[in-house]
């Protein structure tokens, strides 16, 4: 590969096992830059933004998350049978604009939303690379525009693995408000707000937030109820939620995971959920055939000196892609729903 070719592929370069044969491939050898007429596949879309985290008085640095995720994904083993594309980053934010000069949170979210809509319209399954959890409001806006174009709009559900409800009330949107914003948008559209959160830390959510969650009909499990021994009960919660929806948006906030595994986030968990449990949730979500959109949020490389959080985030993206690749036909099966009575 020439130096020019390596530059064109950005972070997608790494080890090549030349003596291991044609099946010894890694992501950097297989991920393609997204072309307009590309066949349906998995599309990585970066959201290099932490403006919402800053507004929420969190620790900045998640804007560098997408770049760190791609670098870490590059050397993972490739087992895919469905294409994976890289669509670059929403907003095209440079380092000088991270303080919201030329780019505001709302313009970043608007660009991400438009690109999500376009990817869904083209038949792709987008996986967002965050960035702060303000990515969720952006993702929802793009997903909703796609959904309302269906002859019979689907019942959309959001499954969030997160230590926080992110239902805060604030003068302006931030990383702590996306699901309150989504609930309000559902009210405007006369849609039911279908939201399930796994990994809630009781010590990190005020009584007011629990009250709001219950008033909105949010399903949730506490982090202390999501150990390995609780996996059957967690799986039952997820399957019950999936039974009541047609399309799923899965969002994984890294602050739900044990702080020992994921220290590189704005607000590390003191107990958290083990990675194996999150992978089990991913398997169930994809196996339902209802997943249309996913993302991983809150990776902060500046707080991740040994890269363990980036490796875990990359593993979760890898798991998502691996499970989707095993059943692409099922993932696509719900895009045109029959009429319901």
Curated annotation (Swiss-Prot):
Mn(2+) 1 binds at residues 133, 162, 166, 253. It is an enzyme of class 3 (hydrolase). One of its GO terms (biological process) is L-histidine catabolic process to glutamate and formate. Catalyzes the conversion of N-formimidoyl-L-glutamate to L-glutamate and formamide. This is Formimidoylglutamase. Pathway: Amino-acid degradation; L-histidine degradation into L-glutamate; L-glutamate from N-formimidoyl-L-glutamate (hydrolase route): step 1/1. Mn(2+) 2 binds at residues 162, 164, 253, 255. Keywords: Histidine metabolism, Hydrolase, Manganese, Metal-binding. It catalyses: N-formimidoyl-L-glutamate + H2O = formamide + L-glutamate. It comes from Aromatoleum aromaticum (strain DSM 19018 / LMG 30748 / EbN1) (Azoarcus sp. (strain EbN1)). Gene3D superfamilies: Ureohydrolase domain. Belongs to the arginase family. It comes from the Bacteria. The keyword Nuclease does not apply. HAMAP family: Formimidoylglutam. One of its GO terms (molecular function) is agmatinase activity. The keyword S-adenosyl-L-methionine does not apply. Its cofactor is Mn(2+). It holds the Pfam family Arginase. Binds 2 manganese ions per subunit. InterPro entries: HutG (IPR005923), Ureohydrolase (IPR006035), Ureohydrolase_dom_sf (IPR023696). Its EC number is 3.5.3.8.
